[in-house]
């Protein structure tokens, strides 16, 4: 998951 946002921390596996 290449997105340095708050969502990237909860969706780090995707």
From Swiss-Prot:
Keyword Kinase: no
Keyword Ribosomal protein on entry: yes
Transmembrane segments: none
CC per GO annotation: ribonucleoprotein complex; ribosome
Keyword annotations: Ribonucleoprotein, Ribosomal protein, RNA-binding, rRNA-binding
GO molecular function: rRNA binding
UniProt record similarity statement: Belongs to the universal ribosomal protein uS19 family.
Function according to Swiss-Prot or TrEMBL: Protein S19 forms a complex with S13 that binds strongly to the 16S ribosomal RNA.
Stated name of the protein: Small ribosomal subunit protein uS19
């Amino acid at each position: 998951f290449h997105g340095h946002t708050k969502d990237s921390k909860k969706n780090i596996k995707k």
